[in-house]
Amino acid sequence: MTMTSTTTKAMAMAAAVLAAAAVAATNAQTCGKQNDGMICPHNLCCSQFGYCGLGRDYCGTGCQSGACCSSQRCGSQGGGATCSNNQCCSQYGYCGFGSEYCGSGCQNGPCRADIKCGRNANGELCPNNMCCSQWGYCGLGSEFCGNGCQSGACCPEKRCGKQAGGDKCPNNFCCSAGGYCGLGGNYCGSGCQSGGCYKGGDGMAAILANNQSVSFEGIIESVAELV
């Protein structure tokens, strides 16, 4: 078998692996207490029913971890609890990300400086579904994801589609049948208007790139070793 045919076969197999991983990661991935405490990748919310996604259905009532609309308690005010998804615990005992949480008095987590985004940074999006606040800084928690949130895991969700003059969602999120931006089956499934909608696997690559830590090169190398 030639090197060219081996590489071609490896790439074909890798593409199939990526497609399967995307569907599993964003359509049926379970988390939280329903799956041994598993954390969703890239700050996706784990819903009360144990599924990964973004939007009110996942980040609202009962949200177990991730970019939950209500900040979880932590630190000395939360019985010594640490934050999920490597978020910071603020001096007041709330989980989030950004200077209000990771700055002065931060109790645990990756204390760090703010990342600029949005209209004050040439439209830059925040990494890992973090919210871009109305002031143009990346973070998680009500100060970033609440009023004026420009992109990311905003609470409440941004409106889109025919219910919002044809607007599309930022971050390539899905626009649900009801006109709300988010990720997961409730947004990308039946009736999805735009974004990475589930259509027999079509459109999944963009969601995979934004929300799943999978290296295409790594898969190529791994598969090549098997052929």
From Swiss-Prot:
InterPro entries named in the record: Chitin-bd_1, Chitin-binding_1_CS, Endochitinase-like_sf
Keywords linked to the UniProt accession: Chitin-binding, Disulfide bond, Glycoprotein, Lectin, Pyrrolidone carboxylic acid, Repeat, Signal
Q: Which residues form a coiled coil?
A: none
Q: Which residues form the Chitin-binding type-1 domain?
A: 29-70, 71-113, 114-156, 157-199
Signal peptide positions are 1-28
Tissue localization of expression: Confined to root caps, several cell layers at the periphery of the coleorhiza and radicle, and in all cell layers of the coleoptile.
**Pyrrolidone carboxylic acid is carried by which residues?**
29
* Residues carrying a glycan: 211
Among CDD domains, the record links this protein to: ChtBD1
Q: Which GO terms describe its molecular function?
A: carbohydrate binding; chitin binding
The intrachain disulfides are 31-46, 40-52, 45-59, 63-68, 74-89, 83-95, 88-102, 106-111, 117-132, 126-138, 131-145, 149-154, 160-175, 169-181, 174-188, 192-197
Q: Which Gene3D superfamilies does the UniProt entry name for this protein?
A: Endochitinase-like
Positions bound to substrate: 38-40, 90-101, 142-143
> Could you tell me which PROSITE patterns the record lists for this protein?
CHIT_BIND_I_1, CHIT_BIND_I_2
- What is the stated purpose of this protein? N-acetyl-D-glucosamine binding lectin.
Task: Output this protein's name.
Answer: Lectin
Recorded source organism is Oryza sativa subsp. japonica (Rice)
Q: What is the lineage of its organism?
A: Eukaryota, Viridiplantae, Streptophyta, Embryophyta, Tracheophyta
